[in-house]
Amino acid sequence: MALIVQKFGGTSVGSVERIEQVADKVKRFRDAGDDLVVVLSAMSGETNRLIDLAKAISGDQQPLPRELDVIVSTGEQVTIALLAMALNKRGVPAVSYTGSQVRILTDSAHTKARILQIDDQKIRADLKAGRVVVVAGFQGVDEQGNITTLGRGGSDTTGVALAAALKADECQIYTDVDGVYTTDPRVVSVAQRLDKITFEEMLEMASLGSKVLQIRAVEFAGKYNVPLRVLHSFKEGPGTLITIDEEESMEQPIISGIAFNRDEAKLTIRGVPDTPGVAFKILGPISGANIEVDMIVQNVSHDNTTDFTFTVHRNEYDAAERILQNTAKEIGAREVIGDTKIAKVSIVGVGMRSHAGVASRMFEALAKESINIQMISTSEIKVSVVIEEKYLELAVRALHTAFELDAPARQGE
């Protein structure tokens, strides 16, 4: 008998019919003797609908964060109650709880709260009594009793946090894909599902644009060593196990995956006086506006001036460009130029630690396709490059083949 935390996302509980299917799956695990805690998101689209209501009533003002948390937290209350009803109908004793009812204690940062502590006594009592415990994801309560929410993707974090608190054998994340792939199968048809991947690799892939798991959930799982498994909600299969182990084998590829992100934009401030502290003068106002900077390149000084280039999320390009124009005037830079038609492609793998020449192999594969590299960033298990967006899919396919990640052709194909 295992203690398993299962998390189902919005598409998995997007209708009564789908909730019935989730109930059937949960019952199969319960019949096999497992103790279960099930974490649910709101129905697909429901959180956005509730936010739109809050915006409509607030008019020209931003919705009050505390009240916004109160309204959006109701989405999960619907799904947890419906699933508990569906399970009881099937003869499986089940009870539903909101985040506040099971004392998922958070800080008071409304709409983006962080989990501080979980009181697991109520859940353990229900499990001991033979009940399936269904918990609302995405939400908690602060020390003053205010409802809080964890931000987008918070249900994944709820699931992992509960698994850590309960010392569960596994946390299963159910999605609309059957695991973590070497890259997006919609771009590379011969991409392969990974049986296993490390937390470190998954964290890099999540931060680089992979949408399978939220970064915070992977960080939490890695910190508390919670085994994670990504599975398809309605298809049977082993999924992908995410653990701390780095298993070496003769057949293990150097690279585990190719990640990419289309939502990048690049800004360059040219003719910057090459003086101490110039990087702070450029990036300080950007940081002050809560704009996240990704990759940074500063050219070698020429005639006591330099060019400074960095990337931001495309949604923040306009705001960053306005700030940079003001900075250019203040520091006496020559001009600001931008580019929103770029993309980032990255190779990720713990095998890079023990193999030399990985970056050059990447650059060679791109050169063979006449793809120009504009920026480069590296870490111990990652190499990222910025290229023209129009070459993105070609680059991903070329790298996938170059690092021998393509699935072998089936017999007869």
Give residue ranges: language-model regions.
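Nucleotide/pyrophosphate-binding catalytic subdomain
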Residues: 1-218, 299, 311, 386-388, ...
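Conserved dinucleotide-binding and phosphotransfer motif residues
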Residues: 32, 90, 224, 289, ...
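Conserved beta-strand segments of alpha/beta enzyme cores
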Residues: 93-95, 227, 292, 372
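Short hydrophobic alpha-helical runs that function as membrane-insertion/retention elements
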Residues: 170-174, 228-230, 294, 375
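Acidic-aromatic/histidine active-site loop/patch
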Residues: 221
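Internal glycine-rich alpha/beta core junctions
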Residues: 231-233, 237
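A conserved regulatory-domain signal marking ACT and ACT-like small-molecule sensing domains
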Residues: 239-413
